[in-house]
Amino acid sequence: DATNLKSAFPTQTNSEAEFAAYYPFHKYQFNILQKFLFSSNALVATQIAARGMIITAFDVLRKQMKDTELFNFTPGHAICTEAQTAPPVALANKYDTAKQILANIKTTVKGDLLLQTIHLLADSEVVYATVENITKSYISDISSYYDVKPEIEKALEILVDAKVLLVSNHHYKITSDLEGKLLEEMKDFPVELFTKKRELTNLLKDYKLFHSVASYSEGSDTFKFSVLSDQGDDLAPQGSPDLRLNVYSLFNIGDVRQDHIDQIKMSTQAKKDEATLIPENSAFDEIDKLITEVKRYQYMEDKYSNEADPNKRQIIREFRIIREEKAKHLRRKIEAAYNDATLIYLFNEQL
């Protein structure tokens, strides 16, 4: 399983003999190395064919793996180090930045080595830089995968937030200077609290989350409810004003959800024509962050919709993909919050 990567070509080692023959490398690493040497311009094409692969493999063994423990394999960052001994200044600066960022948190993951691993995979263009592939390529001890993967995930999240990495379709890449500049511009776009509250209400309408509960049939009788936000917005086709379901916004629940539930139970205990829905808010911070990010990516799309620079246009296209992915994730989180809500009616509460 350590050699089974998501890629454009088969990577899995199929026999013990093949596993042993390539040790301390994995066979697939030579495919990656060849593509990386060509795409990174580390060597010209004739050198790749004649000497590049041999020279790099020898240097990895001589410099990177000479003191390694028996049964450990060559990590991707060791290959990257010897395949590109003089990375561009901008890339070297990214390595240093990532190293400093991760050095300030409690993690065993080295920022520069993580970025080298990602650079090797992304530039090879044959193995996708997903969390799983990055982890498998980063480690030397293949038995440590499940211990290291959560640390890699945490490190990737931190470096994405720091604008060192971009993630799109679950694939990670190191940001270019232009991408970094646009991301910094996007970060400065303010998304006020009232904007986020309004956006959540609009999303609840767009999802049509409450249409199915806006009417109820009992025999030949049909009862239509007014489903309203706690600010009075209609969240479903308008029903009877005498039967109301009030839906609270995630932004209007206090720090202690149960205290809010108890307060609503007291204030509505005599209202026979009114029920109240309190969403489950354990994912509130993530939802808040996602709403902000989606609005910021949308701002960048709108601002650069007529951009003439082809490089910027390409980045904005990537931003659109990222926004769409975050919007889907946001929908799942919001729907889960309201599907797991607490319903309050006449002092009673139920999930």
Residue spans of the language-model regions?
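Extended alpha-helical scaffold and adjacent linker segments that couple domains
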Residues: D1-L351
